[in-house]
From Swiss-Prot:
It is found in: Periplasm. The gene is pstS. Keywords: Periplasm, Phosphate transport, Signal, Transport. Belongs to the PstS family. It comes from Xylella fastidiosa (strain 9a5c). CDD domains: PBP2_PstS (cd13565). Its main location: periplasm. The lineage of its organism: Bacteria, Pseudomonadati, Pseudomonadota, Gammaproteobacteria, Lysobacterales. One of its GO terms (cellular component) is periplasmic space. The keyword Lyase does not apply. This is Phosphate-binding protein PstS. Coiled coil: none annotated. Part of the ABC transporter complex PstSACB involved in phosphate import. It holds the Pfam family PBP_like_2. Residues 1-18 form the signal peptide. Residues 25-47 are annotated as: Disordered.
Length: 364
């Protein structure tokens, strides 16, 4: 089965992209940054030597990284090779210094960063959404509370017409069908944010399963990457899984509404992700170590997540590290439209300034 997003067609097992000559999504957008930080038209590939940048990690951010990479290549001639292997793989590869940047939806704490000689900074904000394969259930129509979602993944609720689900969905016809669980099989920041949220809303989940990039699932089938989970949910009737919103929308999957910490039923969207992120205190988060699941706010999506970029503080190739940072600087300044189109939340200007100050102090 194929998985579609962002104008790319991928087989579920295809997890890497090398951008070499794709056209930008908007021919009129600003496409470069001058030495004083202002956006300008960049030199052509013929005027400057092409640079190859390698990255690996979270599938959560893959649709956006892919689009940014295509546009950056068209603007500068530089090539980005990003492998969608899961946050755990990205962390392992950047620690081993086999790539220029790693990507994780789970922030590392300062002690782990120091031990590994790494720095980290946010790249974008998105949301994890439960997705289901149920006939005649349109996207956003099925409602689940956090405790209900935990009980489903714990295996305590095993039928779609369970009284607890029906109680949250008056008037919605739910079948007498077994619930089939789909989860990640690889080390995953998406899993971290999903399990972190469930640990906040269910004491039983916290005690029995807990949180992490990999957990001991009570049952179900595992898929590799957001791509793999999306594929399995599409194939298995009565299934439920969790993916980043872009995967659900581009594959026309049915996602659920969730009840947030304020008791409101909310739909996943860039707006509800932004509402969840609006009170995030990044200035007091050392090394940007902040998780924003189960945020307060009437309109907040409860499983909102941040993607983080990991880079080595010490390097033998300062020019390569600068080229990598230039890619993210360009993306922050020129990639907001792409982020919005793919239902991510671009970073606010004040946070970008904090990140650039962090670069100056940590990546010397």
């Amino acid at each position: 089965m194929k998985v579609y997003f962002a104008g790319f067609t991928l087989l579920c097992l295809c997890t890497a992209v090398t951008i070499t000559g794709c056209k930008p999504s908007n021919d009129n957008q600003s496409t470069g940054v001058s030495q004083d930080g202002n956006s300008t038209t960049p030199p052509s590939a013929e005027q400057t030597k092409s640079v190859k940048i390698s990255g690996a990690g979270a599938s959560f951010i893959y649709p956006l990284i892919s689009q940014w990479s295509a546009d950056y290549n068209a603007a500068t001639g530089n090539k980005i090779n990003y492998q969608s292997i899961g946050s755990g793989g990205g962390i392992a590869q950047i620690k081993a210094a086999t790539i220029d940047f790693g990507s994780s939806d789970k922030p590392l704490d300062s002690s782990e960063l120091t031990q590994a000689g790494l720095g980290q900074f946010p790249s974008a904000i998105g949301g994890v959404v439960p997705v289901v394969n149920l006939d005649n259930i349109e996207p956003g129509k099925l409602r689940l509370t956090g405790p209900l979602l935990a009980d489903i993944f714990l295996g305590k609720i095993s039928k779609w017409n369970d009284a607890a689900i029906i109680s949250a969905n008056p008037g919605l016809h739910l079948p007498d069908t077994k619930i089939n669980i789909v989860h990640r099989s690889d080390g995953s920041g998406t899993t971290f944010n999903f399990s972190n949220y469930l640990s906040k809303v269910s004491a039983e989940w916290k005690q029995k399963v807990g949180e992490g990039t990999s957990v001991q699932w009570p049952g179900g089938v595992g898929g590799k990457g957001n791509e793999g989970v999306a594929s399995y949910v599409q194939q298995i009737k009565g299934s439920i899984g969790y993916v980043e919103l872009a995967y659900a929308l581009q594959n026309k999957m049915s996602y659920t509404a969730l009840q947030n910490a304020a008791g409101q039923w909310v739909q996943p969207s860039a707006e509800s992700f932004a509402a969840a992120a609006s009170n995030a205190d990044w200035s007091n988060a050392k090394d940007f170590n902040l998780v924003i699941t189960n945020a307060t706010g009437e309109a907040a999506w409860p499983i909102t997540a941040t993607n983080f970029i990991l880079m080595r503080k010490q390097t033998k190739d300062a020019a390569q590290r600068k080229a990598t940072l230039d890619f993210f600087k360009w993306s922050f300044e020129n990639g907001q439209k792409q982020a919005n189109e793919l239902h991510y939340v671009p970073l606010p200007p004040n946070l970008v300034k904090q990140i650039e100050a962090y670069w100056a102090s940590e990546f010397k």
